[in-house]
A protein has these predicted regions:
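An amphipathic, aromatic/His-enriched active-site/gating alpha helix that lines ligand/cofactor pockets
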Residues: 33-42, 61-98
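Short, well-ordered beta-strand segments in beta-rich or mixed alpha/beta enzyme
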Residues: 11-14, 43-72
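A compositional/biophysical signature of low hydrophobicity enriched in polar/charged and small residues
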Residues: 15, 86, 112-113
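Short, conserved, surface-exposed binding loops centered on an aromatic residue
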Residues: 2-4, 39, 46-48
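Short amphipathic alpha-helical segments
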Residues: 16-43
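Short, low-order "capping/linker" segments at domain edges
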Residues: 91-113
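Short glycine-/aliphatic-rich beta-strand segments at the starts of folded cytosolic domains
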Residues: 3-18
Length: 113
C-alpha cells in the first residue's frame, strides 16, 4: 500500500540559542525513532534556527493540532517537552498557554502543477 501523501504542514516558532541546536536535534532524533511521531501522524520534521529563533516544520497527512490534547499527558510527549524545555522558550511567554500558541498561520500557498 503506498504511503499516504503529506497534506498538512505546521510551523512552530519559539526562541532558542544557536548553541543548543545539537542538543535539540538529538532530542528529536531520539524521539523520532520511537512511536510519538506516528501517534501524531508526523511523517517529516525539519528544524531551523535564525538569529535566536527556532523554527520547527512538521509535515503530516492531517493537521496535528487536534491530536495534541490527546497526547499531551503521554509519557513520550512529556519526556520530549521536558528535555526541550531546557533549550527552547516561548516566542512570547506572556501570551503562550499551549503548543497551538506557537503555531504560525499560513496565509499563502503556491504549488507547481
Amino acid at each position: 500500500m503506498p504511503a499516504r501523501p503529506v497534506t498538512h504542514r505546521t510551523l512552530i516558532i519559539a526562541r532558542m540559542d544557536a548553541d543548543d541546536e545539537t542538543a535539540v536535534a538529538d532530542i528529536f532524533r531520539e524521539s523520532d525513532g520511537g512511536q510519538l511521531p506516528r501517534m501524531l501522524g508526523v511523517v517529516r520534521r525539519d528544524l531551523f534556527s535564525f538569529h535566536g529563533l527556532y523554527f520547527h516544520l512538521i509535515e503530516a497527512a492531517d493537521d496535528v493540532a487536534p491530536a495534541l490534547p490527546t497526547v499531551r499527558e503521554h509519557p513520550l510527549f512529556v519526556d520530549v517537552n521536558t528535555k526541550l524545555g531546557k533549550h527552547i522558550t516561548a516566542y512570547d511567554p506572556e501570551t503562550w498557554s499551549s503548543p497551538r500558541d506557537a503555531m504560525a498561520q499560513n496565509f499563502y500557498t503556491w504549488a507547481a502543477d
